[in-house]
Swiss-Prot record:
InterPro entries attached to this UniProt entry: C-type_lectin-like, C-type_lectin-like/link_sf, CLEC7A, CTDL_fold, NKR-like_CTLD
SMART domains membership: CLECT
Role summary: Lectin that functions as a pattern recognizing receptor (PRR) specific for beta-1,3-linked and beta-1,6-linked glucans, which constitute cell wall constituents from pathogenic bacteria and fungi.
Transmembrane portions of the chain: 50-70
Endpoints of the signal sequence: none
UniProt KW keywords: Cell membrane, Disulfide bond, Glycoprotein, Immunity, Inflammatory response, Innate immunity, Lectin, Membrane, Metal-binding, Phosphoprotein, Receptor, Signal-anchor, Transmembrane, Transmembrane helix
Pfam family name, one: Lectin_C
Binding positions ((1,3-beta-D-glucosyl)n): 145-152, 194
Family matches, as CDD domains: CLECT_NK_receptors_like
The protein's name: C-type lectin domain family 7 member A
Gene: Clec7a
């Protein structure tokens, strides 16, 4: 029998030197242990860059627009600014007539299509005249003066159709009376219109409201559908008329 010696590479003391060489050990690729990773997309950095570029462009455009608007406003000289402000105030400033006059809605404004073009604002057109129902209290003389300042006169009723129109307006304000352009110089004297023409009781009658001892009821107002004489210094509303 032959013995095969398996003792190799003995050192000086007789110990066997073990060879742990890793030449025969084959390591698996790292990718096989953890699994292969998908390569990253080459378009991702490009998309991110384009997004940042667009954002920068929008910001720059907004800043330039704001600077341009500021420069345009600051470039206007003081005189132009003052003129602009003054024109704006004039456009929004209410007129004297709009402050003094108040006009109630009426049937005539509905039947005639509102305030007609030939008449001024707050005036109502009927026939060949414009009428203003003034709701600022005044005496007969003060009302006459007020209508004259507007280029008109106190109401003069020429016929029954005109009286029906006026009655349709005043009937909706039965608690109020309106001065008209009819007066007389003395008690029991004849009535005259403001233009000096005589009054003829064809369309209406003037009812007497004065006691026997009073001599001051020398002016006329219309109250609802009735016409009365009254003291001229009494404060009341009025009706102005202007022919077209």
């Amino acid at each position: 029998m032959k013995y095969h010696s398996h003792i190799e590479n003995l050192d000086e003391d007789g110990y066997t030197q073990l060879d742990f060489s890793t030449q025969d050990i084959h390591k698996r690729p790292r990718g096989s242990e953890k699994g292969s990773q998908a390569p990253s997309s080459p378009w991702r950095p490009i998309a991110v860059g384009l997004g940042i570029l667009c954002f920068v462009v929008v910001v720059v455009a907004a800043v330039l627009g704001a600077l341009g608007e500021y420069g345009h406003n600051s470039g206007r000289n003081p005189e132009e600014k003052d003129n602009f402000l003054s024109r704006n105030k004039e456009n929004h400033k209410p007129t004297e007539s709009s402050l003094d006059e108040k006009v109630a809605p009426s049937k005539a404004s509905q039947t005639t299509g509102g305030f007609s073009q030939p008449c001024l604002p707050n005036w109502i057109m009927h026939g060949k005249s414009c009428y203003l129902f003034s709701f600022s209290g005044n005496s007969w003389y003060g009302s006459k003066r007020h209508c004259s300042q507007l280029g008109a006169h106190l109401l003069k009723i020429d016929n029954s159709k005109e009286f029906e129109f006026i009655e349709s307006q005043t009937s909706s304000h039965r608690i109020n009376a309106f001065w008209i352009g009819l007066s007389r110089n003395q008690s029991e004297g004849p009535w005259f219109w403001e233009d000096g023409s005589a009054f003829f009781p064809n369309s209406f009658q003037v009812r007497n409201t004065a006691p026997q001892e009073s001599l001051l009821h020398n002016c006329v107002w219309i109250h609802g559908s009735e016409v009365y004489n009254q003291i001229c210094n009494t404060s009341s509303y009025s009706i102005c008329e202007k022919e077209l």
